[in-house]
Regions:
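Glycoside hydrolase catalytic-domain groove-lining segments
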Residues: 222-263
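Glycine-rich anion-binding loop/nest that anchors nucleotide
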Residues: 257, 290-306
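Aromatic-lined carbohydrate-binding surfaces of glycoside hydrolases
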Residues: 2-5, 12-207, 215-227, 260-261, ...
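Catalytic domains of carbohydrate-active enzymes that cleave complex glycans
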Residues: 140, 144, 148, 152-189, ...
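Catalytic cores of alpha/beta
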Residues: 281
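Active-site clefts of carbohydrate-active enzymes
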Residues: 182, 248-278, 296-297
Length: 402
């Protein structure tokens, strides 16, 4: 390949030698989801949800997600679906064009949620340390009451009917409540939460058979309630034996990063070397982790301009702003999302995870040995780009000969 460029000092020719390996990257061999903000899309691109302009812009965001091999999208349920409170009645058709837009873009599954909420303090902040949940769509209603139960049953029954009508019931992952075992003060508080969580899970499974419950967690303590476990990388390392046992049992374990960990830990923050965002996925391959979740694709709250400030405000009341770049991978350009280098690093990481999976199917011992030259755990690794490329090339050579 010859590329000829013109500079102000004269002409030069750049010769690139490219080695093409006879290896195809498996598509959708590794689960990836990045949560997005519909409100931020509307605000930055001057479109209104439910309009054709919004759907066209959403399609551009979906294409950006697919570029980095994202194959799952998250639709948060809101009170627009609630058409009556006495009796409880729900209508989800307003979500249909948006859901179809993502499936048309090539997505394979969707996340829905949530059923439960922590409620609010008197000052309006979320009640992060609560020992009991309220209904997510009706936050003035305690979940652990007969009326809360009735509300939730009617909600799930209506949702199940809607999903079956569109043929989507087998493509759903459901969040009951994000991080249910994080932020509590006493063991009794956690146990009270767990009892309510299991009740919600039983309602889901009764009226939407076959649904998979997915949740970001800190431990394996909600066994029997969760189907797809998503510990943070630090939580996984702290309880590696627990989560590895779940993997050996045949359960799905993914991972995520959010707010932390910082320092030498692998993460995708804006002030971290790009290679760390890619190595996150090498760690997934090494640990037999089947998916990656992140909360921040374009999470720009009101007043945040990612071109001027990179830290997202934290409204939970339990900490400072989120670290720089934690809340986004794309920038809101004039014609749609503009892709950043961190998205490209995540794209390569997802491709790598799929390729490592191919090698493990054929040569598991070699898979572990090669990965071990670069990755030990999520805070012990080699971030020398040359070494990474050397191991990557050996991976491709091995796959070519398989």
């Amino acid at each position: 390949l010859r590329l000829q460029g013109v500079f102000w000092e004269g002409n030069c020719t750049c010769i690139l030698e490219i080695q093409v390996y006879k290896v195809r990257i498996p598509e959708d061999a590794f689960w990836v989801t990045n949560w997005f903000s519909r409100e931020a899309i509307c605000r930055f691109h001057q479109v209104e949800e439910g309009t054709q302009g919004f759907l066209e812009m959403l399609g551009k965001y979906g294409a950006a997600m697919r570029r980095m091999h994202q194959n799952i999208f998250f639709i948060t349920l809101d009170d627009r679906c609630m058409v009556s409170k006495s009796p409880w009645k729900f209508d989800f058709e307003y979500l249909t064009p948006m859901i179809q837009c993502f499936f048309d873009a090539g997505m394979k599954r969707m996340e829905l949620g949530t059923l439960l909420h922590r409620g609010f303090l008197e000052n309006g902040e979320p009640n992060m340390y609560t020992d009991s949940f309220v209904c997510s769509l009706e936050t003035g209603l305690k979940f652990d009451t007969l009326e809360g139960y009735a509300h939730t049953v009617e909600l799930v029954k209506s949702l199940a009917k809607y999903l079956r009508f569109h043929g989507w019931e087998k493509q759903v992952l459901f969040h009951i409540h994000d991080e249910p075992d994080i932020h509590y003060k006493k063991p009794e508080d956690l146990e009270a939460r767990r009892r309510e969580y299991y009740l919600a899970a039983s309602i889901l499974r009764k009226y939407l058979p076959g649904v998979s419950v997915i949740e970001a967690v800190e431990s394996a303590g909600f066994y029997g309630g969760v189907d797809v476990w998503v510990p943070g990388t630090a939580g996984y390392e702290a309880r590696k034996e627990e989560f590895d046992r779940l993997i050996r049992l045949g359960e799905q374990v993914w991972t995520y990063v959010c707010c932390s960990p910082e320092g030498w830990w692998l993460n995708r923050f804006l002030d971290f070397p790009l290679i760390r965002g890619r190595l996150l996925f090498w760690g997934c391959a090494k640990n037999r982790i089947q998916g990656f979740l992140h909360w921040g694709f374009n999470q720009f709250p009101e007043g945040m301009d990612p071109f001027r400030g990179t830290s997202c405000p934290n409204d939970t009341g339990i900490g400072t702003n989120f670290p720089c770049g934690d809340s986004f991978l794309v920038y809101p350009g004039p014609g749609g999302p503009e892709i950043g280098m961190r998205l490209e690093a995540q794209r390569r990481g997802a491709e790598d995870a799929a390729l490592w999976g191919l090698l493990r199917e054929n040569e598991e011992a070699l898979h572990d040995r090669l990965l071990g030259e670069v990755f030990v755990n999520n805070h012990t690794y080699c971030q020398d780009p040359q070494k990474l490329e050397e191991v990557y090339e050996r991976l491709l050579k091995e796959l070519e000969s398989c």
